[in-house]
């Protein structure tokens, strides 16, 4: 540093903001330079912000509109659910990426999500697609297999084992992953009041799940399996893991309807019937108290701030699902046939017949593959042995009556017959 002419040293000042020792808490000295505590904090914020910007540039932090647009590529319908999910997921990962820049004055809570809707309506697909869009590790668990620690069944922490395995044991990646717990309605407690007897697969599991969905340091066996005292554990912080839970919640609509319309009696009172209030409208009005009445404990519901529903899929929805998504079943079969140099075509009535069969089986979208597999089995068995086939047409008779499809051979295809 420069010296004064009288030989006395200049008062040390921060080389960045020029503040003296009386204006700052601390000055850190280096070779001919000083930096104050305020500038150190500012530098840390700049570095953290650059880290966040790198994450954004890498596509990890998408806007809600971008997330929904990506979901639209794979999931048909469910626009309200997709909007709610997109906002919740965006806020969750914004909280994760900006954690280093957030002040201690404001604590952002996790945006865990509950999806209510019938089987085959797309709950699992939504969660799985979110993980694909965000490029984070993903794990699916079945709530019906979970029990309290010490009982026959899977410990709740085994959910995290699968997530860690899917992340190739990258703890940092796993700590920002997504876990989908299906059939969450099946662990509702028995009865309205607190359980007096041990309920190892109901209220007990809800109690066991509380900590990991809220955020805790979980001890995980290195290669899965049961814990034992001599074993070394992997510690996984679940504070930034997004938990999405789904269930059919059969009977929840009656609880909602009773709250909305029940209790009023007498002349002049309009009684709402089920026909007047569609199931989707009822589920769209679900409140946390309805879920408590169903059997989820208040503490559990309190850790799931985002609750939405998915609609039952109609015939038109299923027909679109067969054709429109990037991984649509019809597209997949057409690609398989294309590898054998055969064009595959479904008539519109044939696709509707497939959709109707899935509805009759009450399996929703997941039943479409089973129906198509049955329809296509004999065709795909025989086709590789056939010669000269250029086009295969699946009509209603093939789907409903098991008849042979229309095969167009090379000469016929050329003449257009």
Swiss-Prot record:
One of its GO terms (molecular function) is zinc ion binding. SMART domains: AAA (SM00382), ClpB_D2-small (SM01086), zf-C4_ClpX (SM00994). ATP binds at residues 118-125. One of its GO terms (biological process) is proteolysis involved in protein catabolic process. It comes from the Bacteria. The keyword Metal-binding applies. Pfam families: AAA_2, ClpB_D2-small, zf-C4_ClpX. Zn(2+) binds at residues 14, 17, 36, 39. CDD domains: RecA-like_ClpX. GO terms for cellular component: HslUV protease complex. Keywords: ATP-binding, Chaperone, Metal-binding, Nucleotide-binding, Zinc. Residues 1-55 form the ClpX-type ZB domain. InterPro entries: AAA+_ATPase (IPR003593), ATP-dep_Clp_protease_ClpX (IPR050052), ATPase_AAA_core (IPR003959), Clp_ATPase_C (IPR019489), Clp_protease_ATP-bd_su_ClpX (IPR004487), ClpX_bact (IPR046425), P-loop_NTPase (IPR027417), Znf_CppX_C4 (IPR010603). SUPFAM superfamilies: Glucocorticoid receptor-like (DNA-binding domain) (SSF57716), P-loop containing nucleoside triphosphate hydrolases (SSF52540). ATP-dependent specificity component of the Clp protease. It directs the protease to specific substrates. Can perform chaperone functions in the absence of ClpP. Belongs to the ClpX chaperone family. Component of the ClpX-ClpP complex. Forms a hexameric ring that, in the presence of ATP, binds to fourteen ClpP subunits assembled into a disk-like structure with a central cavity, resembling the structure of eukaryotic proteasomes. This is ATP-dependent Clp protease ATP-binding subunit ClpX. It comes from Oleidesulfovibrio alaskensis (strain ATCC BAA-1058 / DSM 17464 / G20).
């Amino acid at each position: 540093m420069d010296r004064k002419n009288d030989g006395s040293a200049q008062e040390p000042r921060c080389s960045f903001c020029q503040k003296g020792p009386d204006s700052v808490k601390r000055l850190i000295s280096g070779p001919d330079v000083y930096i104050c505590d305020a500038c150190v904090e500012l530098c840390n914020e700049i570095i953290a912000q650059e880290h966040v910007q790198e994450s954004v540039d890498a596509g990890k932090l998408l806007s809600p509109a971008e997330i929904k647009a990506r979901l639209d590529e794979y999931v048909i319908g469910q626009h309200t659910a997709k909007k709610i999910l997109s906002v919740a997921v965006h806020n969750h990962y914004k909280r994760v990426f900006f954690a280093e820049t957030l002040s201690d004055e404001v604590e952002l809570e996790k945006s865990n999500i509950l999806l209510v809707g019938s089987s085959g309506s797309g709950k699992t697909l939504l969660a799985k697609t979110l993980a694909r869009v965000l490029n984070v590790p993903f794990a699916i668990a079945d709530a019906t297999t979970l029990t309290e620690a010490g009982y026959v069944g899977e410990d709740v922490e085994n959910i995290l084992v699968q997530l860690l395995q899917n992340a190739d044991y990258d703890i940092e990646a796993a700590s920002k992953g997504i876990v989908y717990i299906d059939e969450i309605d099946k662990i509702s407690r028995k009865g309205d009041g607190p359980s007096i007897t041990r309920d190892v697969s109901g209220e007990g599991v809800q109690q066991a799940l509380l900590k990991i969905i809220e955020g805790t340091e979980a001890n995980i066996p290195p290669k899965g399996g049961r814990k034992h005292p001599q074993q070394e554990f992997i510690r996984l912080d679940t504070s930034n893991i997004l938990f999405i839970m789904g269930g059919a919640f059969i009977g929840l609509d009656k609880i909602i309807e009773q709250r909305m319309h029940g209790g009023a009696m007498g002349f002049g009172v309009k009684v709402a019937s089920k026909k007047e209030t569609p199931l989707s409208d009822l589920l769209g009005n679900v409140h946390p108290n309805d879920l408590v009445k169903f059997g989820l404990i208040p503490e559990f519901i309190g850790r799931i701030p985002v609750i939405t529903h998915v609609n039952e899929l109609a015939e038109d929805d299923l027909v679109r699902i067969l054709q429109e998504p990037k991984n649509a079943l019809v597209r997949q079969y057409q690609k398989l046939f294309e590898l054998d140099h055969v064009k595959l075509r479904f008539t519109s009535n044939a696709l509707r017949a497939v959709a109707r069969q899935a509805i009759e089986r009450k399996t929703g979208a997941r039943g479409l593959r089973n129906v198509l597999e049955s329809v296509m089995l004999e065709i795909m068995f025989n086709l590789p042995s056939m010669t000269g086939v250029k086009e295969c047409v699946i009509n209603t008779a093939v789907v409903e009556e098991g008849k042979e499809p229309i095969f167009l051979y090379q000469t016929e295809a050329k003449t257009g017959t």
